[in-house]
Amino acid sequence: MASRVKPSVVYWLGENLYLNITNRCPNNCYFCLRNFRNGVGGFNLKLEKEPSVAEVVMELGNVINKKNWREIVFCGFGEPLERLDCVLEVAEWIRRHYGKIVTLRVDTNGQGFLLNRERDVVRELKMAGVDKVSVSLNAHDKETYNQVCRPSFKNAFENVLEFIEKAKGLLDVEVTVVRIPEIDIQAAWEIAKRLGVKFRVRDYIQPFW
């Protein structure tokens, strides 16, 4: 069971390598996998402490050459942009040592500007070598977002839309929603279409109880 193994900073699924750098998140989504599982693919993603940049780089260095990875993704049991500087430093390390042979992606709830006030988050990601962001929209309006994602920030939904709008000019942007009853998938798709970004629906992974 995942709960019996050491917490993983680096894990892999299919052709992608993932970096689990924090368990902090400003949202408390009722459907989040971490509410009823300790990890995925046999990896335990419940961190005992946040890894330093040096620790992330060390773990990454142990596995990065084991396969021709399609993407390296900042994604775990938390919001990566809670640790923007860690994301930037690790991305820069990857580009410095491995060039552009692998795509770098950040999976985010899109609240990077709220988490990092007074910073040009999107441009900093671009300058560090990040290619793509996958933004979890998970709603078709503010009321639904507040209901299912339960954000700690006021006006989180509006800020997610702002993040998408600013990111699309510099990065490859995909918007995702989870297939749950509260979300109007068509209306969410219309938002993505209006913003001019790609759209993907993710299946809801049910708890086992």
Go through each PLM region and give its residues.
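Canonical Radical SAM [4Fe-4S] cluster-binding loop centered on the CxxxCxxC motif
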Residues: 4-55
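Surface-exposed amphipathic alpha-helices with a cationic face
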Residues: 88-99, 126, 164-169, 189, ...
